Amino acid sequence: MQNWETTATTNYEQHNAWYNSMFAANIKQEPGHHLDGNSVASSPRQSPIPSTNHLEQFLKQQQQQQHQQQPMDTLCAMTPSPSQNDQNSLQHYDASLQQQLLQQQQYQQHFQAAQQQHHHHHHLMGGFNPLTPPGLPNPMQHFYGGNLRPSPQPTPTSASTVAPVAVATGSSEKLQALTPPMDVTPPKSPAKSSQSNIEPEKEHDQMSNSSEDMKYMAESEDDDTNIRMPIYNSHGKMKNYKCKTCGVVAITKVDFWAHTRTHMKPDKILQCPKCPFVTEFKHHLEYHIRKHKNQKPFQCDKCSYTCVNKSMLNSHRKSHSSVYQYRCADCDYATKYCHSFKLHLRKYGHKPGMVLDEDGTPNPSLVIDVYGTRRGPKSKNGGPIASGGSGSGSRKPNVAAVAPQQQQSQPAQPATSQLSAALQGFPLVQSNSAPPAASPVLPLPASPAKSVASVEQTPSLPSPANLLPPLASLLQQNRNMAFFPYWNLNLQMLAAQQQAAVLAQLSPRMREQLQQQNQQQSDNEEEEQDDEYERKSVDSAMDLSQGTPVKEDDQHQQQQQPQQPLAMNLKVEEEATPLMSSSNASRRKGRVLKLDTLLQLRSEAMTSPEQLKVPSTPMPTASSPIAGRKPMPEDHCSGTSSADESMETAHVPQANTSASSTASSSGNSSNASSNGNSSSNSSSNGTSSAAAAPASGTPAAAGAIYECKYCDIFFKDAVLYTIHMGYHSCDDVFKCNMCGEKCDGPVGLFVHMARNAHS
């Protein structure tokens, strides 16, 4: 703020003197006007500025010359004397012309001297501004006060001896000092200049926000100058082209393309016909040619932006959005572009926060792969799933956490579909490194019709969850998968086969431990109670009676064969799995897939119990993973349960059997339970006879169990075994023999069989 009290007093005479010094020679005055002129000229003497003495002297000299010539001009014009001849008039006219020429020369000298002084002083002097009130300091003097040189003090000289050139020089200096610098703009503030230095870093980060296709398109300019000369941005920084394969940096597009060609296979190189651009991808070449033709079919619906591909348009649309999808968990950094977010995390070592969707809702299933090369966030598919989660109760799959190092569990939810009921026997995958407190083992119901009382596990025994392939999770998330071809079998068959394969892997180790704990504590009354319980089943989720083509023939032929004493001590209770819930408590965690041959033992136990007292021969199938189990109580509904808990008979030692039967055996048990029939169609002889499999269509021998060594699955039915083995190719066992597609292990082969129809 200016201090109005300390400012100089207003002096208008100073400006009048400056104005008169500019135009004094051109002002014509009356003969009696010299007094007023003297009074006007004398007034500047009172001014505190001493440099006005030169102006006063110059004005006095000009006025005196004019006063001397005016009477003569007037006299000659009004009273021409006859004695005067034309020669005198011509002489007077010549004198006036010479005087005018002299004045013009003086004016030219004034102008030239002013120009020379202007070129000599490169800076503009801050002086009088017509827009500034008189007497106030000029604002420009505040900025250029340090550059102002002191005004020269005039030397006292007589008015008669002042040369015109000297007067012109002095007046030009005053004119230069009093000329307002109208075209000078003040410099930028330091705050703005510091901000301008930070802006290049931000713009450099935003240059990499484009998609992968747009990065390739950056090298597709058809201007020959742009591809052969380095390109500089608005901040003067040269653009570099870095090779993603070896890290070589080029400064021109031509050099970058020539280097990129060395990494490409000759038969895959695609070159632009108009420039040296090369690529291995057809769509990149297509986008490049579009730029040559100036074709931009993709246009923004909110502005006039057009581009050559959809990726560029998607990246541009983020500029219209107010949602910042990527946020840092350690600072306030937020951006709309994933690549800039990765650069921030790499530079400062920060951790990513919750990723938002385009509408601003948090999406915990997205993970930021900081050092990955793939565009965009990564979907967390292979993360550990908390135990007890069922895919039927939520739309999205259960994920562990937002970041890889964070974990969270979700509560168990009831199953509402047949597939979920069929997969309830599968223990979900758990991380071995997770502590027990972080991932507690929750018991799963055996089926919608049953509930779990308690589960006892021994830490020394391996859990089948560690060996379970990810097919159970796959089936839970994709419940609408296509049916098997040939048979009217749904995914429940696939679930039973996978369960049998997993449990069969545990049989060698678990069999020895469980045989030591077998006890003979069963009676016929419990068998009768179990039979009555089975008859109460309304429907079976594993009812595959319509899916086995030769089921009735096998049953009829096997019933006619004489029953042979079997060397086995395994007892599996027949049990159906209805879809309706029941009030009775279940004694099993998972579904027990029974062996139908034990029904024959039950029927014989009523007549001749001595036949069942035979030596124990272990089954080559998987046993229950539960060890150290308590003895089975008498109450049928209150005992502890496990995935494959065995039942006792009065004369047969108790042992656990695996659910090694496939969907065919479960279909047989479903038929037997629904009809209330105690007969069976096959029995186990204690050995795996995969080589002794009969041809398709022939009745299976009593006690024959067929094993697929490739998939580690046991079959009771020869037809299903033959159909299954027909999918294994001779040259590659995991290549589909029907269509020739290569599969990844037994799980991949089963998924291929489920999803693809073969003719």
Curated annotation (Swiss-Prot):
Matches recorded under InterPro entries: Znf_C2H2_sf, Znf_C2H2_type
Disulfide bonds: none
MF terms in GO: DNA-binding transcription factor activity, RNA polymerase II-specific; RNA polymerase II cis-regulatory region sequence-specific DNA binding; zinc ion binding
Acidic residues bias: start-end ranges: 523-532
Superkingdom to which the source organism belongs: Eukaryota
Skewed-composition ranges (Polar residues): 39-51
Residue numbers bearing the Phosphothreonine modification: 179
SMART domains given in the database record: ZnF_C2H2 (SM00355)
Record field: compositional bias (Low complexity): 399-419, 513-522, 655-696
Keywords: Developmental protein, DNA-binding, Gap protein, Metal-binding, Nucleus, Phosphoprotein, Repeat, Zinc, Zinc-finger
Annotated spans, Disordered: 30-51, 171-215, 366-419, 513-565, 606-696
Entry's Gene Ontology BP terms: anterior/posterior axis specification; generation of neurons; negative regulation of transcription by RNA polymerase II; positive regulation of transcription by RNA polymerase II; regulation of neural precursor cell proliferation; regulation of neurogenesis; segmentation
Gene Ontology CC entries for this record: nucleus
Compartment list: Nucleus
SUPFAM superfamilies registered for this protein in UniProt: beta-beta-alpha zinc fingers
Compositional bias per record (Basic and acidic residues), positions renumbered to this chain: 199-215
Pfam families in alphabetical order: zf-C2H2
Residues with the Phosphoserine modification: 189, 208, 210-211, 537, 540
Zinc finger (C2H2-type): 241-263, 270-292, 298-320, 326-350, 706-728, 734-758
Keyword DNA-binding assigned: yes
Function statement: Gap class segmentation protein that controls development of head structures.
PANTHER family, per the entry: PROTEIN HUNCHBACK (PTHR24392:SF49), ZINC FINGER PROTEIN (PTHR24392)
Similarity comment text for this entry: Belongs to the hunchback C2H2-type zinc-finger protein family.
Protein name: Protein hunchback
The species this protein was found in: Drosophila yakuba (Fruit fly)
Source organism phylogeny: Eukaryota, Metazoa, Ecdysozoa, Arthropoda, Hexapoda
